[in-house]
Amino acid sequence: MTVRKLEPLLDPRGYQERPVIKLAPRVTLDDLRKGKVLFYDNTKLSFCNYNQVFIRIKERLAELGITNFVDYVETVRGKDTAELEKYAAMLAKEKPTAAIVAFGDMGTSAATTIVAIALEKLGIPTVYMTAPPGSAITEGVCRVSRRKFVPLLRRRLPGQHGGRGTRAD
């Protein structure tokens, strides 16, 4: 068997700095009971009956004594990275204990991932909900942001069949 050496590829964008992202510290159930949970809908939950996802999550959290919620609905479309990070900073002013971000699909996954990463950078533990083909796009964005984030995206959410859910924790 002959081993063939592959030549390195030349990236026309040049060298790109890719800092390691440190995820926000995880919180306890007691922290969630005392604090506020941010629900961010990038407008995708308005399709079909997808809004039931947040309704059911809130019902389950209420069963655990977690009842302080704040909701935001805003599209990520048409915004660049700086605008998405600025929007995440605005969400962070609510001082949530944790955030749930949804919904990543083909058209919004990359931008919504940027919001989720920005929330993590601001110290807010964030769960990002997505499904194929959006989850593959999310993984790509996270790889660009840094590898440490990617393995955490491969866990299937409870009750999911077929598709891969992504978690940013």
Label each region the model flagged.
Residues R154-D169:
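A charged, well-structured terminal subsegment
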Residues L84-T97, V115-A118:
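Short, well-structured alpha-helical segments in soluble
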Residues G134-R146:
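Glycine-rich, charge-decorated loop segments at or immediately adjacent to ligand/cofactor-binding or catalytic sites
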Residues L61-T75, F149-R156:
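Short beta-strand elements in bilobed, periplasmic/extracellular small-molecule ligand-binding domains
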Residues K36-K44, V70-E74, A98-A102, V127, ...:
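Short glycine-rich or small-residue beta-strand-to-loop segments that form or flank ligand, phosphate
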Residues M1-R26:
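N-terminal amphipathic/basic leader segments beginning at the initiator methionine
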Residues A111-I137, L153:
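Short, acidic/small-residue loops that bind anionic groups at enzyme active sites
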Residues D30, K34-N68:
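Glycine-rich phosphate/diphosphate-binding loop of Rossmann-like nucleotide-binding domains
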